[in-house]
Amino acid sequence: MKKIFLTFTTVLAMASCQNKQVNNTENTQTEAQSSNTENAMTLTQEWDKIFPKSEKVDHHKVTFKNRYGITLAADLYTPKNTQGKLAAIAVSGPFGAVKEQSSGLYAQTLAERGFVTLAFDPSFTGESSGEPRNMPSPEINTEDFSAAVDFLGSLENVDRERIGILGICGYGGFALNAALSDTRIKAVGTSTMYDMTRVSANGYEIKMTPNAQGTYDRVPGNTPEARRKMKEQMNNARWESAKKGYASYLPANNLDPKTITPETPKFIAEYADFYRTKRGFHSRAVNSSPEHSWADTGMLALINMPILHYAAEMQTPALLVHGEKAHSRYFSEDAYKQIGSKDKELYIVPNATHVDLYDNKAGKIPFDKFEEFYKKWLVVNK
């Protein structure tokens, strides 16, 4: 049972109080639901990003719908002083983050390098709509990328034959899945990728402490019996969740820097240093919230619906970027082996951890590599 709770908390909520996972008070749930609902489509016009605004690009807030009727909020970045139709890139992630954090930084930086870019909040999170709030869905979150392609392809200054996508962390997996489904996507990149369906079903397939080289040794994932117990736990909680319209939430994660101890896994401490400090905190991000986390039934689909089942059929050019010392490195290594694209590359950033690629605090995001990749497949070869 200990591993089950580890999987359940570190993947979706990282909740510090196991018993409260299925026993949030009704008042807390109602307040959280009301607050998120009222603010779901209030688009903040002021610059509230964790990174400075570039003078090299134009920025606009935009909205668009996916095929489920959910309205997504996004930031559109366009390089200044350009003419004609340009290549475009849709960006999202990390899992539990918002467009004002990592995805916006990636989007703005790539716009400085000549692309029209779109950083969007996934369905049910941030400024995007969707009820109940904070509900992950492998299908809908994959669809969000295709909806972003729809939007970009409708713009007069975008060549719809030159659209790519980029997913960060958990949205790296969803980006690969979107490229498998959507043949309009001409290039797919990932940064510090997670496969959220795999980690939800199997837990972390690593030892929780790095080895002497600073990397993480592999271990077997969850057994079918362990997954069965997880599903029983969540489905028992679902009775109460159904009474509240599925708007009951896991407690806030345990990323408060004050709770980090020497016994805390190193990568959890790194998450805390990003999401709960001035460095990367944003009030709309699930992972930054001190009040509540994901919807408590949200993990069910992630456990049961693997996203990369047909990875061998992928033909889209792919670039998978990961840190050498990231606990999550095995996701990119395995995905690289699985995907069938003849034009694929696994690029390992020396000495970088998972969170090093969330922002450029350590100067380790290989923007030159991303630029080279997207220009090759969206500009030079078109």
Residue ranges and their predicted role:
Residues N39-G84:
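N-terminal cap/lid segment of alpha/beta-hydrolase-fold proteins
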Residues K85-P94:
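Short beta-strand element of the alpha/beta-hydrolase
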Residues G96-Q108, P122:
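The serine-hydrolase catalytic nucleophile loop
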Residues T109-E127:
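Conserved alpha/beta-hydrolase
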Residues M135-E156:
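Alpha/beta-hydrolase active-site loop
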Residues N177-R276:
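Alpha/beta-hydrolase-fold enzymes
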Residues M314, L320-H322:
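Short beta-strand/loop motif that positions the catalytic acidic residue
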Residues P350-A352, N360-K382:
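Catalytic active-site module of serine/aspartate enzymes centered on a nucleophile-bearing elbow/loop
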